[in-house]
Every structure is written in structure tokens, then in C-alpha cells.
């Protein structure tokens, strides 16, 4: 439901194979709720048995993220609901290495329990398809004009949307959620053209990149957003823009 419903969302995390000497880091981050920034929950330290429980106030269902070391695991956090997440830490560590990043045999390292376990599980197969700016994007957009940047972002959006729509492993609820997040990230990327283009050389570590002329005709630049269905839908409640 998209109705406002203030209540506690509880996340219980179990790290299988955990040992304190591993220095494992664990953060749980909300993607909206009261703030336009990704906000970490306060939580207790990981217990010696690898368990950790977090509770936070929420007013809407939202996608939150468990970050274990550098691996991000999205899930649906819902008011007045508890999600139990079991993570196989040795397998996750193996899957995070470049040697096994594409090895399907080491991909299964997380299991969910709760009302939305099916959506949470399916989200893992599309989590790399919901942001138009990927790991090479800032390198790609160095030196682009605003219009070139817009075309780059639009092509990325269309490619990722097609991948979500053709994914037979996800149900309609997960597909709608992934489409909504991708669409709003697309809109966010268009609005953030000045900052992204300006910061690209520094982030990509490139010197001598000419400064782009940031002047645009705003009406034509943002014209593609008129076709974005999520802007006319209640699903935009799941994002902070």
C-alpha cells in the first residue's frame, strides 16, 4: 500500500560464517524518509554470533539497502513489518571479487524472510539495472555538452528499462518497483546535469578537460520527461523527487 502509515520497520540481519576478527562492516541505509539523502540507520554492533537488529520509523514502504563491506543488498522496508535477512558471508566475500563476479555458482549469498521476501529476492536480479549512471559513467561523460549528456542518460535509461521488462525471473510487483526507481533516477540524472558534467573530470581523474557550456533551452532539454509515466503515477511516492 502507498498510504501513509507511521510505524516501525525492523530489520534482523544474520551473518553466517561471521568472526569478529574479520572486521566486517555493516550499514543499513534508507533511500528516502524525511530526507533527500541516503541516511544510515543507527544500529547496535554486530554480535559475536553475527546477528544485528535495527528498527527505524517509517511512513511509507521504501527501498532500503544493507551494505556489507562493499556489497549492497536492496530490500523493501515497510512500516509495521519485520524483514529477516540471512547472509552467507564467505560466499558474499567470494562473489565480490573480480575473479568470481560473473560466476553464477557463488551468486546466492542472501535469503529473506517476511511478507515481502519474494520481492526482496527478485530485487537482487535487477539491482544493477535501476540507476542510469553506472561505474564507468563519469569517465564516459567527461567533456560532454548538456545535450550529449542528456542523450547518453536517455540511451542508458532505455537500455536498462528494456532489461527490466525482459527479465522473466521477476514478478509484476518487482518489475513495477524497479521501473519506478529507474525512472526517477533517470529524472534525477537529467536535473543534475550541471553537477555531474562539472564533477566528471575530478571523479574520473582526467585533467585538461575543457569546461562545458552549461547553457540549455530548458523546455527542449527536459521534453523527454513528459513521456515518463511514473511522474503521473502514485509510484513516485517511493522516491524523494
Tell me the role of every PLM-derived stretch.
Residues 175-241:
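Extended amphipathic alpha-helical segments with heptad-repeat/coiled-coil character used for oligomerization
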